[in-house]
UniProtKB/Swiss-Prot annotation:
Pathway: Amino-acid biosynthesis; L-arginine biosynthesis; N(2)-acetyl-L-ornithine from L-glutamate: step 2/4. It comes from Brevibacillus brevis (strain 47 / JCM 6285 / NBRC 100599). It catalyses: N-acetyl-L-glutamate + ATP = N-acetyl-L-glutamyl 5-phosphate + ADP. The record marks K8, K220 as: Transition state stabilizer. HAMAP family: ArgB (MF_00082). GO terms for cellular component: cytoplasm. The keyword Kinase applies. The gene is argB. Catalyzes the ATP-dependent phosphorylation of N-acetyl-L-glutamate. Its EC number is 2.7.2.8. Substrate binds at G41, G42, R63, N156. One of its GO terms (molecular function) is acetylglutamate kinase activity. This is Acetylglutamate kinase. Its main location: cytoplasm. NCBIfam families: argB (TIGR00761).
């Protein structure tokens, strides 16, 4: 059987994902491919925060989470977003099971020292529950919330970071980060932008310094590098289409492929 594939679905892509994307997942599952989905929910969270008159704040692409924001994040991620994804997968013919990083202390975290409020730094990703779900023939759909070791505190975790930690803990073959852009975009001499088809850890650090990679793409590539450093073979940043997903799983050159080192020879 092929190695595990972890798919991270960005919040900005959620409403744009076509039925064919979920049908592709169902098809892969039917072929024996083990798939784990980790999802965000940024726009839906921002919409709910707006309704309760809380202004969203971000630092380097990471959400600042006060106690009131945390309650909204938990409600939106574990409630509406997680179950909406499970429903869409079910409608497409897949078998899916929704959980969060809180369940079974799947994502064990401590509060970050950074000025981000109730945001956690993952100390351990326990894959007991996701593996049990996979063994039963389901796709685990994981909301990126985490819990303290004593179970008393809940922390928000950036979905890219959570996906990277989960992929590493599962020794996944691929981590696919689905976004609303076709990959890392690099400015060209004629003023246009082109997709970076392949890149390395060193090149990514250079693109961050040169501000080619900015905003929400920063935690994506940092999570990618963390996952690669912990044994994940390949990270791909691509669009949420059936064609891109199936292409990546088939080993085709799609989006931006990130490896620790890239041989251009």
């Amino acid at each position: 059987m092929q190695g595990i594939v972890v798919i991270k679905c960005g919040g900005s892509t959620m409403d744009q994902l076509p039925d064919s994307f979920f049908q592709a997942i169902a098809g892969l599952q039917a072929q024996g491919q083990e798939i784990v989905i980790v999802h965000g929910g940024g726009p839906a969270i921002n919409s709910m925060l707006d309704r309760v008159q809380i202004t969203p704040q971000f630092v380097d692409g990471l959400r600042v989470t006060c106690e009131d924001t945390l309650r909204v994040v938990e409600m939106v991620l574990c409630g509406s977003i997680n179950k909406a994804l499970v429903k869409r997968l079910t409608q497409a013919g897949a078998k899916a099971w929704g959980v969060s990083g809180i369940d079974g202390q799947t994502l064990l975290a401590t509060k970050t020292p950074k000025p981000l409020g109730w945001v956690g730094e993952i100390k351990k990703a326990d894959m007991t529950i996701p593996k049990a779900i996979l063994e039963q023939g389901f796709v685990p759909v994981i909301a990126p919330l985490s819990v303290s070791e004593d179970g008393t505190e809940t922390y928000n975790v950036n979905a890219d970071v959570a996906a990277g930690a989960i992929a590493a803990a599962l020794s996944a073959e691929k981590l696919i980060m689905v976004t609303d852009v076709p990959g890392i975009m690099q400015p060209q001499p004629d003023g246009t932008k082109a997709v970076v088809s392949a890149t390395s850890a060193e090149e990514i650090q250079e693109m961050i310094r040169e501000e080619i990679i900015t905003g929400g793409m920063i935690p994506k590539v940092q999570a990618a590098l963390d996952a690669l450093g912990q044994g994940v073979e390949q990270v791909v940043i691509c669009r949420g289409t059936a064609e891109d997903l199936l292409g990546v799983c088939a080993g085709q050159a799609v989006g931006t492929t990130v490896r620790m080192n890239v041989n251009y020879a």
